[in-house]
Amino acid sequence: MRSFLNLNSIPNVAAGNSCSIKLPIGQTYEVIDLRYSGVTPSQIKNVRVELDGRLLSTYKTLNDLILENTRHKRKIKAGVVSFHFVRPEMKGVNVTDLVQQRMFALGTVGLTTCEIKFDIDEAAAGPKLSAIAQKSVGTAPSWLTMRRNFFKQLNNGTTEIADLPRPVGYRIAAIHIKAAGVDAVEFQIDGTKWRDLLKKADNDYILEQYGKAVLDNTYTIDFMLEGDVYQSVLLDQMIQDLRLKIDSTMDEQAEIIVEYMGVWSRNGF
């Protein structure tokens, strides 16, 4: 049975402070709705979801989470942003859609801590924060989405990136390249083109055909356009080279965001 819980008051909410939302252990979390006022989403920085002190997902600012929800056309409302652990865009193959979506719920049975951490910018006018949890019967953490970001320098011309982590047994659902000058991207595995060099306009149109919103200054390689987990890239031990070839019209720093999926463990990725 799904239930709804007003989470405890968030301590240390003030401009310039670091804060943590501590989720009660023993529940399975489907969605966390974070309400905010007196602070902009861009002023809530270095957002980290941690299980037992280990990073699960990170966002440069809370606005990046809003953009993630925008891309999937999830409900967006001013003054609140939602952490969707259950993924409503997923479609079942051998199971129902609901089973597939709930497979990614954040179980906490057996954990010691489960936290959402962030920093509040010193320029925030008068921040106020509260959170509501949508939760269900407790389970241990299993399949989860793990969002990681990396910063790379792009050249005016072609830049090859071949050092993204390849944790064996995990999957890649999507790769996002956030940079204004990205013109086209090719994706290779062990020298084989999985995705040819596609111009951003052509890639954007493909995303739109599958019901995804296109984000400004972002080139998204979505391996699960139909919401099918089996279309994602399985990182097996045979893969020796995973490579992005990025054509850019300027020298700039890019944020590379990789959405990994896999079974969480204390000793895992």
Swiss-Prot record:
Where would you say this protein principally sits, based on its record? virion
Question: What Gene3D superfamilies is this protein classified in?
Answer: 2.60.120.730
Q: Where in the cell is it found?
A: Virion
* Keyword DNA-binding appears in the UniProt entry: no
Instruction: Respond yes or no to whether keyword ATP-binding is given for this record.
Output: no
User: Which InterPro entries does this entry report, sorted A to Z?
Assistant: P2_N, Viral_Major_Capsid_sf
Record's superkingdom? Viruses
Keyword annotations for this protein, in alphabetical order, are: Capsid protein, Virion
A Pfam short name? P2_N
One Gene Ontology CC term in the entry: viral capsid, major subunit
Oligomeric state and interaction partners are given as:
Homotrimer.
Function, as annotated, reads:
Major capsid protein.
Q: What is this protein called?
A: Major capsid protein P2
The scientific name of the source species is Pseudoalteromonas phage PM2
Lineage of the native species? Viruses, Varidnaviria, Bamfordvirae, Preplasmiviricota, Tectiliviricetes
Name of the gene this protein is made from: II
